[in-house]
Amino acid sequence: MSTPTQSLQVKLLDPRFGDLWPLPAYATESSAGMDLRAALEAPMTLQPGDAALIPSGIAIHLADPQLCAVILPRSGLGHRHGIVLGNGTGLIDADYQGPLLISTWNRGREAFTIEPGDRIAQLVILPIVRAGLQVVDTFVDSARGAGGFGHTGVR
């Protein structure tokens, strides 16, 4: 595994980390995200259409205002079982220090049971660009212009 390029402060809020479960980690050399686990006390079944906030068992503090973290779904859970994030993407600001909760939604057609310790989401650290607004009357023309949804076609 490659050497981390950024330090991340983490609080372990669940004593099963380090004993029963490994710390969040990158699964492969080129993984962009660290898997987050369901720090549940007992199995939780999500019926079709149900949503739940699931504790990850950790809190993080990025501290660097040029970074943020995002909680993203795991592709296999979404594709195979319809388990996605209820809020699409969870955005974690650099100054947030509270527990990471995973908004989980069953958009599938069948009930799905999440077991304690299941890897249900992933955490990705991203750089942030903070823009200053410049009010203008018109924009410089671009090839796309104001073309929106579907404007460029599918072929």
Swiss-Prot record:
It catalyses: dUTP + H2O = dUMP + diphosphate + H(+). It is an enzyme of class 3 (hydrolase). Keywords: Hydrolase, Magnesium, Metal-binding, Nucleotide metabolism. Its EC number is 3.6.1.23. Gene3D superfamilies: 2.70.40.10. CDD domains: trimeric_dUTPase (cd07557). GO terms for molecular function: dUTP diphosphatase activity; magnesium ion binding. InterPro entries: dUTPase, dUTPase-like, dUTPase-like_sf, dUTPase_trimeric. GO terms for biological process: dUMP biosynthetic process; dUTP catabolic process. SUPFAM superfamilies: dUTPase-like. Pathway: Pyrimidine metabolism; dUMP biosynthesis; dUMP from dCTP (dUTP route): step 2/2. Its cofactor is Mg(2+). Belongs to the dUTPase family. This is Deoxyuridine 5'-triphosphate nucleotidohydrolase.
